Amino acid sequence: MTGAPSARRSELSTQNRLTHIDETGAARMVDVSQKDVTTRLARASGRVLVSPRVIELLRGEGVPKGDALATARIAGIMGAKRTPDLIPLCHPLAVSGVEVELGVADDAVEITATVKTTDRTGVEMEALTAVSVAALTVIDMVKAVDKSAVITDVRVEAKSGGKSGDYRRTAPEGPDA
């Protein structure tokens, strides 16, 4: 029992610091070799604000460059798989599944990515990368029609598995929500 308060302090200090920075402030890749292999899932979302003309084209004849949503879906899947090549301290993982969904709203293309693995660390970065690459691809596909498209609201919506437990983003409350 004498070690319990010390262990709790250590756990709290670990939760309240950046794990990718060592004591001297240098970047490092976290050692996950002692973590349990568990099934982990993450879902992220984002939006690409586009002009009414782009919405009209996406709902109708399509944009001049081709099938924007199908291209963005494949790009998002590829992005999830390439995350450790793009994010320097991200661990290479055995990604076991990626789903990227795109929908056309009244003012935006809405993107959701779900990534799954059975590994030692989570797939939040893979889900965020999938959304981001899909969003960039939407912009590439519509730029001939709308040069002012904007990527917004890229965020983790939920995660499960692992030591830190489950997370689900809650909607903000209040009149401006």
Curated annotation (Swiss-Prot):
CDD domains: MoaC_PE
Keyword check for Lyase: yes
Catalytic activity: (8S)-3',8-cyclo-7,8-dihydroguanosine 5'-triphosphate = cyclic pyranopterin phosphate + diphosphate
MF (Gene Ontology): cyclic pyranopterin monophosphate synthase activity
Gene3D superfamilies: Molybdopterin cofactor biosynthesis C (MoaC) domain
Protein residues bound to substrate: L89, C90, H91, M125, E126
InterPro entries per the UniProt record, alphabetical: MoaC, MoaC_bact/euk, MoaC_sf, MoCo_biosynth_MoaA/MoaC, Mopterin_CF_biosynth-C_dom
Any GO BP annotation: Mo-molybdopterin cofactor biosynthetic process
Subunit structure: Homohexamer; trimer of dimers.
Family: Belongs to the MoaC family.
HAMAP family: MoaC_B
NCBIfam families reported for this sequence: moaC (TIGR00581), PRK09364.1 (NF006870)
Protein's UniProt name: Cyclic pyranopterin monophosphate synthase
Source organism of this protein record: Streptomyces griseus subsp. griseus (strain JCM 4626 / CBS 651.72 / NBRC 13350 / KCC S-0626 / ISP 5235)
